[in-house]
Amino acid sequence: MTGLYELVWRVLHALLCLHLTLTSWLRVRFGTWNWIWRRCCRAASAAVLAPLGFTLRKPRAVGRNRRHHRHPHGGPGPGPGPAATHPRLRWRADVRSLQKLPVHMGLLVTEEVQEPSFSDIASLVVWCMAVGISYISVYDHQGIFKRNNSRLMDEILKQQQELLGQDCSKYSAEFANSNDKDDQDLNCPSAVKVLSPEDGKADIVRAAQDFCQLVAQQQRKPTDLDVDLLGSLLSSHGFPDPDLVLKFGPVDSTLGFLPWQIRLTEIVSLPSHLNISYEDFFSALRQYAACEQRLGK
């Protein structure tokens, strides 16, 4: 039985090297250039159109006819139309403009900081909930979020109240911590899981054990192990594979984030999660909605 375990582990290691290393590097590299290109285009458009804005600007309304609109962050900001008066209306309109929406989004922090921003990650989680993303994974390679998962949950609850207001009471969701079987309720229809480097390795070990059990029970042969079978064994142990990962930081690596499950994942790179804006978040969703996933074909 020991020899079978060793054989399975060697096969898994070879498959991981072949399927992940090159694809992960290329997607991270191209994702960074795409983000820089969008930023440059946005700045150029603003420089060209700014004079027209000053020339064609209408005079502001005064007195009791003047209105103030809300930004998705909860702060004041100008904007026409009823959708701007309530963040949730804007989020609904934004979602309708997308051709597709990820079912599972990963938030991957690779920055070398003393402590990541719990409030900024909580805002990202709440935005995911608001637009209808069903599964959200939060990961940092130092395991800070996982060690402080209760603090992160408190921050998410706080951000929900600030960004969603009374709408929070209409929903319920699951805060799934792999170290705590007593899941805690949140007030939005999504499941949130906090991960660390150990989780991806543990999933592969459990999948290998399941396969060895099937072989021992003569339900499978050792030669039956392939990409599809391993994927099905892994998916039976938790969330579906991520459709989209937002990677924050300059590191051209996913640093152990679910190494097998992201072989077909779209990765969008952003410089930092600090002071992340809703516009950057929605820009990543637009990029995902516009991409054509060939699934290896």
UniProtKB/Swiss-Prot annotation:
One cellular component term from this protein's GO annotations in UniProt: membrane
Tissue specificity annotation: Highly expressed in heart, liver, kidney and pancreas.
Cofactor needs: Mg(2+)
Subcellular location: Endoplasmic reticulum membrane
Spans annotated as Disordered: 63-86
Protein's UniProt keywords contain Glycoprotein: yes
UniProt pathway annotation: Protein modification; protein glycosylation; Lipid metabolism
Pfam families recorded: Prenyltransf (PF01255)
Effect of disrupting the coding gene: Embryonic lethality before 6.5 day post coitum (dpc), as well as loss of N-glycosylation. Defective cis-prenyltransferase activity and cholesterol levels in isolated fibroblasts. Conditional deletion in endothelial cells results in embryonic lethality due to vascular development defects in yolk sac and embryo.
Domain of life: Eukaryota
Protein family (similarity comment): Belongs to the UPP synthase family.
Protein name: Dehydrodolichyl diphosphate synthase complex subunit Nus1
